[in-house]
């Protein structure tokens, strides 16, 4: 887990550097590799803009990117799900090796790694999708904020370069952000307090960011989080996961009950 946090911290630091190093306008004359990627994304959005409707281009490109990243997302979600399923066993290991000395910690680490290996869980493999996804999504976000061509035009009631005057997109972005986090945490065996707090804090933050942001950016947040909700319901439906988990528990209880009944019958025959 510490390694996972370390790698996640490294990724966040790298993204902050990328963001800080590039805040000015991006044009066809930009030569920096990161800026070229941003401009390439912007060009695709313009290509997808039916009848010059940049809003449609933003929606289609967001859906396209999220769909292409779907296999990576699934790898990450499957790894997280396996980790959740192993929580009871991990707690048992922690109870077996409660010591804080170096030897006890090493024994706990080795036992944990053996458990991961036995169940096909790889911490490194679970981080790789994150390393690939985040820069792509950041480049898409910066295409909307740093390429002037994507800041102009109207879509429905929106002026894409200005905030939503009716707060419709900020509200939708916040609602879908909440639903996405809530659905992801719904099937967790053990509720993480930090994740629970973030489930309620993030939507509020997204709302205020979207209120101040250009409508093009708010549109991206809304579509991206709506896609995330649909994706979770289709591929990682928490209600289905909970039902399957309960079915396994019930089946095990029934199996144990049959064993006890068989043992009682055997004792009566004696």
Swiss-Prot record:
A lipid is attached at residue 21 (S-diacylglycerol cysteine). Required for the insertion and/or proper folding and/or complex formation of integral membrane proteins into the membrane. Involved in integration of membrane proteins that insert both dependently and independently of the Sec translocase complex, as well as at least some lipoproteins. The gene is yidC. One of its GO terms (molecular function) is membrane insertase activity. It holds the Pfam family 60KD_IMP. This is Membrane protein insertase YidC. It is found in: Cell membrane. Belongs to the OXA1/ALB3/YidC family. Type 2 subfamily. Disulfide bonds: none annotated. Keywords: Cell membrane, Chaperone, Lipoprotein, Membrane, Palmitate, Protein transport, Signal, Transmembrane, Transmembrane helix, Transport. It is a multi-pass membrane protein. GO terms for biological process: protein insertion into membrane; protein transport. The chain crosses the membrane at residues 44-64, 125-145, 163-183, 201-221. The lineage of its organism: Bacteria, Bacillati, Bacillota, Bacilli, Lactobacillales. Its main location: membrane. Residues 1-20 form the signal peptide. It comes from Streptococcus suis (strain 98HAH33).
């Amino acid at each position: 887990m510490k390694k996972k946090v370390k790698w996640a911290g490294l990724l966040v630091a790298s993204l902050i550097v990328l963001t800080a190093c590039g805040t000015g306008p991006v044009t066809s004359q930009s030569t920096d590799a990161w800026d070229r990627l941003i401009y390439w994304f912007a060009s695709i959005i313009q290509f997808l803009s039916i009848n010059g409707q940049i809003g449609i281009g933003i929606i289609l490109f967001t859906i396209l990117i999220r769909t292409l990243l779907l296999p990576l997302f699934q790898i990450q979600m499957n790894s997280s799900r396996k980790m959740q399923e192993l929580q009871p066993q991990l707690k048992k290991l922690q109870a077996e090796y409660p010591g804080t000395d170096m030897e006890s910690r090493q024994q706990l680490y080795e036992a944990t790694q053996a458990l991961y290996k036995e169940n096909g869980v790889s911490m490194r493999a679970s981080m790789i999708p994150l390393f690939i996804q985040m820069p792509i999504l950041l480049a898409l976000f910066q295409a909307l904020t740093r390429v002037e061509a994507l800041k102009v035009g109207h879509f429905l009631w929106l002026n894409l370069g200005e905030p939503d005057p009716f707060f419709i997109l900020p509200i939708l972005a916040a609602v879908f952000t909440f639903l996405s986090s809530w659905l992801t945490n719904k099937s967790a065996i053990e509720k993480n307090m930090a994740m629970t707090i973030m489930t309620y804090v993030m939507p509020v933050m997204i709302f205020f960011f979207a209120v101040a942001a250009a409508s093009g950016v708010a549109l991206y947040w809304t579509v991206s989080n709506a896609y995330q909700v649909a994706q979770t319901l289709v591929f990682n439906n928490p209600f289905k996961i909970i039902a399957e988990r309960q079915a396994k528990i019930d089946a095990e209880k029934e199996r144990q009950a049959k064993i006890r009944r068989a043992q009682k019958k055997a004792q009566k025959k004696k």
